[in-house]
Amino acid sequence: MALTRLLIKDFRNIEAADLALVPGFNFLVGANGSGKTSVLEAIYTLGHGRAFRSIQAGRVIRHDQPEFVLHGRIDGTETERAVGLSKNRQGDSKVRIDGSDGHKVAELAQLLPIQLITPEGFTLLNGGPKYRRAFLDWGCFHNEPGFFAAWSNMKRLQRQRNAALRQVSHYGQLRAWDQELVPLAERISEWRAQYSAAIANDIAATCTQFLPEFSLSFSFQRGWDKESEYAELLERQFERDRMLGYTALGPHKADFRIRTSGVAVEDMLSRGQLKLLMCALRLAQGEFLTRQNGLRCLYLIDDFASELDSTRRRLLAERLKATHAQVFVSAVSAEQIEDMIGEKGKMFRVEQGKITVQSQD
């Protein structure tokens, strides 16, 4: 699977761009603020419905324009698909797939599985549990057909339960919500546990290659006491939840922890080592998807050289080449990505939102 063409209109500082892309490595070179990260963000937005640097639509729409428009062509294993997304300043989205409107953003995500590696991506390791839940949920979304519907319903019921907690006086008034919520919560938790167990060996193998000096352990925490039934716990915790005004325990508190010698990796590893670990997690997840479903991820790597010395850059470059996936890499100069440049690569020069193809001779 590869994105063969990308059209960008009024996104960030890019007025208009029409890019013919290659299945291997696509390099974006330019000074800071030139717009190279905006290209990566446009691809990410086409696959997620939102940008990775801002959740507000108005901030990614070019100045004085009413909306941004993105189009892409995806070369799949059997057919070519056409996808499109537009969003106005009020946040209203339109999704088009193969010429027809009325589709959902989740359908774009299924067609364009994307792994993102950015300088801000350390939050996967040193940020709150929500970032690691998102990591697990990405895998469950692409591996369990019923996951997204169950997850969406669970989130809706959690919101309704939290609102009800601020109005009810005894647990019986919540029972109707919990009878719906508990089966979904347990199913989501089981899917996450199964996925984390299934991918652990892939992560460990990649980490052994990237960080052989560390022995890492992985553990999934479902968000409530493993000895307790969730239905019983919710009833037992009612008074506490009512005082708090929200549900304190459940799958919305789940986490996926990584340790070395019993210590959290964020407290032991250097920033360069943490970046390699982050890359290992993203690569392992993408390779697991390929093995399970035959789908290849798109890898978006912003500021490739950040935190990595030349040895580590070569290591990451070789591993990315081995995936045979489509890779988009941004860098300030061509020298920073010389370890990646090969016969299957295409280089773009980005200057003040203008994108041109650059010869690699």
Swiss-Prot record:
**InterPro entries associated with the record:** DNA-binding_RecF, DNA-binding_RecF_CS, P-loop_NTPase, RecF/RecN/SMC_N, RecF_2
Q: Which residues form a coiled coil?
A: none
What keywords is this UniProt entry annotated with? ATP-binding, Cytoplasm, DNA damage, DNA repair, DNA replication, DNA-binding, Nucleotide-binding, SOS response
GO cellular component, alphabetical, reads:
cytoplasm
Protein location: Cytoplasm
User: Which residues does the record give as ATP binding sites?
Assistant: G30, A31, N32, G33, S34, G35, K36, T37
Pfam families for this protein: SMC_N (PF02463)
Main localization category: cytoplasm
From what superkingdom does this record's organism come? Answer: Bacteria
- Family per UniProt? Belongs to the RecF family.
Q: What is this protein called?
A: DNA replication and repair protein RecF
Gene expressing this chain: recF
